[in-house]
Amino acid sequence: MKFSTAIIVSFLFIADFCAAQSGVLDISKFGGKPNSDIGQALTSAWNEACASTTAAKIVIPAGTYQLNGIELKGPCKAPIELQVDGTIQAPADPSVIKGTEQWFKFLYMDHLTLSGKGVFDGQGATVYKKAAPASAWSGKNSNSKVFMNFGFNFVNNSIVRGVTSKDSKNFHVMVFGCKNITFDGFTITAPGDSPNTDGIHMGKSTDVKILNTNIGTGDDCVSIGDGSKQITVQGVNCGPGHGLSVGSLGKFTTEENVEGITVKNCTLTATDNGVRIKTWPDAPGTITVSDIHFEDITMTNVKNPVIIDQEYYPWNQCSKKNPSKIKLSKISFKNVKGTSGTAEGVVLICSSAVPCDGVELNNVDLKFNGAPTTAKCTNVKPLVTGTAPVCQAPGAPAASTTATPAASKTATPAAGKSPAK
């Protein structure tokens, strides 16, 4: 009797184990092998997972794989986790994937998890060499015409954690039309001289969180585009790169308002810019940008640490004949400390057509060669409190000052000069 009971218990354990594993789909079971293209195997595994009425996990084991591009599309019947523990390589030849497509694209998903220790290698070195120098990239050789590493399009209630995006030929990650998507413990890496390799760019998305993430690129570590609302960037290490940016904005008539942005507890090291808002002059966009907060930011040798630039025109792509029409309001820079690579630690260049309202500098304590940095301001009178450089701008909305000034300087920016892209 005891023997029979033991057999039954063992059988039930095995049955339960098998049932628990039934939702795990290893691509090797679908023909996916290291050192070969896994497009078909991954597509087959995805189709099976997407049709499942219970949660499923797709696993790409350790090893090096090739992939010429894939679109993983929903809606699916239940949550899906894609666990990547290997290295997946994009085509080195940018012409394999046409236009501005995304190499690894997710569409119309709810409850997606992308996890693992894996690396998505965009193999961008050939593009970087072809397009140098960066200042020439606005023409036909621009890498804006080649593919990005990732696209998350209309992906909701989802998380990306643990994986690495390496050497994308264009932006690393595009987030578009998403709601409640989180990047946590994500790594993005590309050479500091790799143009247009923004880390995470988002647009027309709500409740996006970028947490505890390391980003080093040749462009903005994070760029927040139009239609972005309730965005949190927290615990991000940025460098090399062009900093943490809202914008650029105003270039197109179809743009939507930006509001509710919080950038907090971030560290920037040797970046070309720090925390920044940028809008185009002489452009048709008329949106509003409000409730933007940068707080508890640490900088080490950062050029242009604090910037509002409403005369943003990289590589002279436009004119400053007419001012920006983008209205900026309720913007704060609080507890920003560290060292600057430029004497001017704060540059606030607002629009003469719609001057900035409600800008606050609170404990902005930056040093250049051991001395406090200065401030340059146009069309804005910020409220300055604590230790911070004080600036004034005649004709702008009134603001009070209760600061312990680190320095004070009022100036008009030199013609034709704009902070680095």
From Swiss-Prot:
SUPFAM superfamilies per UniProt: Pectin lyase-like
Active-site residues, as the UniProt record annotates them: 219, 242
Top-level EC class: hydrolase
GO BP: any one term: carbohydrate metabolic process
Task of the protein: May function in the depolymerization of the pectin in its walls during pollen tube elongation, or in that of the pistil during pollination.
Gene3D superfamilies noted in UniProt: Single-stranded right-handed beta-helix, Pectin lyase-like
Recorded family membership: Belongs to the glycosyl hydrolase 28 family.
A Gene Ontology molecular function term of the record: polygalacturonase activity
Intracellular or extracellular location(s): Secreted; Secreted, Cell wall
Keyword match Signal: yes
Protein name: Polygalacturonase
E.C. number: 3.2.1.15
Placement of PbH1 repeats on the sequence: 178-204, 205-226, 258-279, 289-310
Cited InterPro entries: Glyco_hydro_28, PbH1, Pectin_lyas_fold, Pectin_lyase_fold/virulence
Secretion signal span: 1-20
